[in-house]
Amino acid sequence: MAHWQDTVDVDGVRERDFAVEVDGRTVPGVLWLPASGPGPRPLVLLGHGATRHKRTDYLVALGRRLASDYGFAVAAIDAPGHGDRRVPGHVDDVALFGDFLTEWSREGTVDDTVADWHAAIEAVRDLEEVGDGPIGYWGLSMGTIYGVPLVAVEPRIQVAVFGLMGLLGPTRDRLAADAPSIACPVLFIQQWDDSLIPRAEVFELFEALGSLDKRLHAHPGEHAAVPVEEIAFSARFLARHLAPHAGET
């Protein structure tokens, strides 16, 4: 079941909050749409990183860019323990990161989040202004932890952007098992000096991806220092595969 809020027009991009109910969980989300026009249109799913949420600045900027420049529908949801699903009173990054580590270790966290995404996909595609167009996925760091298993089992996803993650931690075996099933084009973004995710584990995950159309872009700097130019490139990469002529003038 989906619950929709009123549409708000912000500088020519329509924005609408929603929530889906999944096995007793309430999963909040946000949808961005171009100013006008019916579907079907491509849909891009945005997965946020640990301690962040569906309205983190870089996600909002990317969602609005994909909606305004390419005419896409764009959806983001709060992962377990994040955003509107965080533990009451936990607002600082230290507490939120501790909550993430607990959730990352929880059996069933991946399956639950994949189910959350499936419910969000169905709710969004039921809208006349979205419809049954092709789907892309974009998610770095924790967005890759949950994104790889989703893309592996969702045949409607035709292109993916991953990064800032490797084969490590509690979900190492799950990602190693799911990555070979991914056949769509993939852009993988990595920070060369990332002190959180060692390069060797990054290369392991990249190599495990089953896609024959994949590329790894590396940049100097720490985990969160992805250049804005790379984010812009990732938007063009999604557009090239979802709607080759979108954004042309």
What is each of the regions a protein language model found here?
Residues T51-G63, A79:
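The serine-hydrolase catalytic nucleophile loop
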Residues A115-S181:
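Primarily recognizes the serine-hydrolase "nucleophile elbow" in alpha/beta-hydrolase
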Residues I182, F188-Q190:
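Short beta-strand/loop motif that positions the catalytic acidic residue
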Residues W192-I197, A224-A225:
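Acidic catalytic loop of the alpha/beta-hydrolase fold
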Residues M1-G39:
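N-terminal cap/lid segment of alpha/beta-hydrolase-fold proteins
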Residues S211-T249:
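C-terminal catalytic histidine-bearing segment of alpha/beta-hydrolase fold enzymes
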Residues G39-G49:
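Short beta-strand element of the alpha/beta-hydrolase
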